[in-house]
C-alpha cells in the first residue's frame, strides 16, 4: 500500500469529512494547532493557516504543502470549508469576522481534535502539569511496541522531529487542554489526569470547585468500558476518585497506587526506579528524564501501556531510549566561556509547581553546580493569581535574572509585573534578583552573572525559548561582549 492509499483509507473513518476539502487554521503557528494541521495535511486535506510571524511550526507545515499566511486578513479564508481557531485568537480577528459573514463553520482546536479521535482508540492526557511529557512517553511506548499511533503533542518529540504524526493504526494519543475547558469535546477510550491545580481560573470564574467538576465531566466522557488513569499522589485527584463513575487505575509513589514507583534514584539526567503493578511482575526501569515529577509521568505512561497489554520489553526500551521533548529540561550544551564552563538548560515550565519541580530536578542531578535561573513570567493574570507562590519558588535558586512578564495578549496589571515581582523577592531576603526590562538585554547581562561550573536554566513559556537558543548561538552572550 502506498502512502497516499494509506491516507485515503484513513479518511474513510469519517465519510462525511470528505465533503470538507479545505481547512483553515487561525493561529496555525502554535504547537497544538500546528500538530492537528500536520495530521490533516497528511490525511490529504488542503490546509491553510495564518499567524503573526513565521516559526518552526509554520515552516514545517509549508514544507508539507500547507499554505501559510503571515498576518491575518479577511481574504485568507476565501474558499475554505471550515475555520479552526486557537484560544489565543481574539473575537475581532478579521478572519473570524469574514468567516462569520460568509457563514463558514468556525470550530475550536479541540473540536477538530475530537473529529480525529471520533473513530479511533483515543488516549487523552489532561492535567495542570506534565501533559506534554506524559503524552510523549505514551506515544514512544506505543511506537516501540509497533502500534504505529497517530499523536498530537504540545511540544517537539525529539525522536520524531515533530510534535504530530499520522500513524496507520487505530490509536490516537493527544494532549487534552483544560485551559478553556475545550477538552470536554473529546471522547477518548482512555483518559489520564496527572494533577489538578489552580490555573487558567478565568475560564472557571475563579471557582476551583468548578474546575474540579469539569475534570470529572471530562473523565465521564469515557465510554462505560473506558479507563481513567489518575495520579493518586495528587491530593485533589485523590479527593475526586470517589466521584469518577468509570474504571480507575491509580499511579504514584503512594502505597495504595495500582502502579507504584519504588527505589527512586536520580543519576544526572536520568532516573532509575522499580515499578510494582497488581498481578504483574515488578519492572526495573531507567527513564532518560530528570526529576521525581518525570517518574510520575513515566508511571502514567506505564499504566496506560499495561492496560493495553503492551509487552514489558517495549516499555523498558522506550523509556530507556527516550530522547526527550523540546523545551522540557532540554540540555542545550556545555559552553567554555571566559568565566569558565557553563551548562545551559531550557525549560517550558511557567507555573510555580512546574518551576519548583525543575529546580528540584536540577539540584538532584547536579548538586555541586550553582543554579542560575533566567525566568520570564507568563501572563499577568497568572502572575497576579499565584504571586506569593512565585516569590517563594523563585527565591530557591542561587542567582535569579528576572525578565518582564510575557503578556500573551493580556493587558498589564499593576503590581503583577516583573519589577513588582523582583521587588518582592528582594524583600524576602534570600537572594538579590536582577531585573531585565527587555529580553534583548539578557545576553548583555549574563556575562557579569555567570561563573565556572554554573547551571544556567532558562525558564518560562514565552519567547525565552528563542532567547535560550540565541544564548547557545552566542556562547551565552560572551561572543556579543567580545565583538563590542
From Swiss-Prot:
ATP binds at residues 127-133. Its main location: cytoplasm. Pathway: Cell wall biogenesis; peptidoglycan biosynthesis. GO terms for molecular function: ATP binding; UDP-N-acetylmuramate-L-alanine ligase activity. Gene3D superfamilies: Mur ligase, C-terminal domain (3.90.190.20), Mur-like, catalytic domain (3.40.1190.10), NAD(P)-binding Rossmann-like Domain (3.40.50.720). InterPro entries: Mur-like_cat_sf, Mur_ligase_C, Mur_ligase_C_dom_sf, Mur_ligase_cen, Mur_ligase_N, MurCDEF_pg_biosynth, UDP-N-AcMur_Ala_ligase_MurC. GO terms for cellular component: cytoplasm. Cell wall formation. This is UDP-N-acetylmuramate--L-alanine ligase. It comes from Shewanella amazonensis (strain ATCC BAA-1098 / SB2B).
